[in-house]
């Protein structure tokens, strides 16, 4: 018996919702932009194998891999429920670049915990599993946050609530939007991108942030795409972080001139996203980004749609 789970890339913040908004995306051409984890019966308590395009970026010691940490916390939770942990082998297929702003760590965490849960006939419910995912994300970045793991696991656009036992809830989205994702091939550490932000903000920025975020959520619920796109503005992080992203301002200006509805930094960068209404515009923007924003052979551009499903079982073999 074995199970394979795929977990998609995600856009943390979606510009307008710093630390409280996230969206899962998948390429329209069927490319798997995300990690896969296989769990199968093993001879020992835990064995980890690694594969995939970015396997050389993973720690050599399996016990330094986040998937090992996922197995440990999953074992801790099963013990609380008096459920027997099966001896198993996990294989992480690392298809996502690390430090890319695409929720790379979230992909590994979500795929690992979802696969472990499925392999054990789902002893943990959705909220319990999501809480573990946030805990693991916190282990990597230093603070528990759900804006990548929630959309990666649950799909679509997720708003973090963390009240009344609710971690996040989905926000109505615009299914005809294209999301152009461009990763330049360089690394930006989340810690560095957080350190660059000010400790305090001006009142006018706080007011603007509240207006944009409230306006975006309102426009999503009332299905006003033009208004929603206008509200995708970031006064919290982008003004400070764009200096970490060579060519971002130029790319944003080009995308706007080409007809994109909005452009922003995905997570803490360096990946950017550009929202387009027409596929022709998305293709034009993607071509320009391939030629002008991508810096090396590790970089890539994908035209995506929102991934409404989130993580999913893709069979029993990688």
Curated annotation (Swiss-Prot):
Binding site for ATP: 97-107
Gene3D superfamilies to which the protein is assigned, alphabetical: 3.30.230.10, GHMP kinase, C-terminal domain (3.30.70.890)
Chief location category: cytoplasm
Alphabetical UniProt keywords: Amino-acid biosynthesis, ATP-binding, Cytoplasm, Kinase, Nucleotide-binding, Threonine biosynthesis, Transferase
Class in the EC hierarchy, top level: transferase
InterPro entries in the cross-refs: GHMP_kinase_C_dom, GHMP_kinase_C_sf, GHMP_kinase_N_dom, GHMP_knse_ATP-bd_CS, Homoserine_kinase, Ribosomal_Su5_D2-typ_SF, Ribsml_uS5_D2-typ_fold_subgr
A Pfam entry, by short name: GHMP_kinases_C
Protein's pathway: Amino-acid biosynthesis; L-threonine biosynthesis; L-threonine from L-aspartate: step 4/5
Cellular component terms (Gene Ontology): cytoplasm
Chemical reaction(s) catalysed: L-homoserine + ATP = O-phospho-L-homoserine + ADP + H(+)
Keyword Transferase: yes
Location in or out of the cell: Cytoplasm
Assigned EC number: 2.7.1.39
Record flagged with keyword rRNA processing: no
GO molecular function, one term: homoserine kinase activity
One BP term from GO: threonine biosynthetic process
Role played: Catalyzes the ATP-dependent phosphorylation of L-homoserine to L-homoserine phosphate.
NCBIfam families reported in the protein's UniProt record: PRK01212.1-4 (NF002288), thrB (TIGR00191)
Family named by the database record: Belongs to the GHMP kinase family. Homoserine kinase subfamily.
Protein name per Swiss-Prot or TrEMBL: Homoserine kinase
Organism for this UniProt entry: Vibrio cholerae serotype O1 (strain ATCC 39315 / El Tor Inaba N16961)
Gene: thrB
